[in-house]
Amino acid sequence: METLVLEKNKSAYKLQNIPPIYYINLDGEPERKIYMESQFKYWEIENYTRISAYDGRDDDLSDIIKGTYPVNMTSGEVGCTTSHLKAIKHWYETSDSSYALIMEDDIDLDLVKFWNFTWKDFMRGLPYDWDVVQLAIICTGSIHVKLHKRFVNDFSTACYMINRHHAEKLLKFHERNGKYKLDNGA
């Protein structure tokens, strides 16, 4: 990852009123922290929080799991899932904002400069009953540009916006006194 050159960003106005951002970053990846925070500076985003990620690849995470360790998930998936639940919980308990952006530390905001809309325009276009809006996908085929209901092949935890109501549902289902219950479907 390279550090951004910080020339004047003439498109930063497009992200005015963006909700608080919670980005997930492994403690052992300081260059990704620098990368993300240089992007936030470039885009004039000040309302962000780093969430220390759980590394399921190398660490035994059984001490943060409540119930049966999920056998249908890889250790990396357990680390990813619990890190996202940790980020959601942190936002839910420390902020009164109606919604938040949760993102991983390899998101590239560069495409925002090509938007022909602002964040405010984007928010006005959302269905009134949204719970989660996926803002980045892993796509092995065509990319759908318009807002659409979830498709089976669109998956990613790279970046999404979540509202308080849905966060509360997820936490009630998966969080038990600082531990994460994943044997009930994650």
What are these regions (language model features)?
Residues M1-M103, I107-A186:
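An acidic/histidine-cluster motif and surrounding catalytic segment
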